[in-house]
Amino acid sequence: MTRHFCASVFVIDPDTKKILLVKHKKFNKWVQPGGHIEENETPEEAALRETYEEPRVKVKLLGERFPREDDFIRPLGIQRNTNNQGDLHIDITYVGIPVNKIDTTVSNESTDSGWFDKMELLYLNVFPDIRITYDYIMREVIK
């Protein structure tokens, strides 16, 4: 089994309460922006890079830094996903808010991107944990 370390960001616009999602080419599902952590890259750097590469949105990651200012931001969580080939993807997930209010674009890894509210999320083709995580973020992080 090959292990892949990844980073992703649940980007939430606090004004509209919408979540930013990209439509993944391989899965044909809407997912949070993210991807593999590159060599000599921290999870935070990968999360910020992937969010800018895919939908072209710059974000500020939310979370606490313990115990020193130069420590990493505490992620929302770590997800474990296994693909059809048996590869394990360990995804360090963050919450972020957009710094720039520009329209999203599409990368070579996705077919579409957009902002969705809670009602729209109910009808999108997403993995179940996307809806669960959105509700948790709205309840515990964004408030």
Model-derived regions, located:
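Short connector loops at helix/strand junctions that flank enzyme active sites
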Residues: 2-6, 25, 32, 85-91
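Conserved Nudix-box catalytic region and its N-terminal flanking loop in Nudix hydrolases
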Residues: 17-60, 66
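NUDIX/MutT-family hydrolases
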Residues: 93-95, 104-135
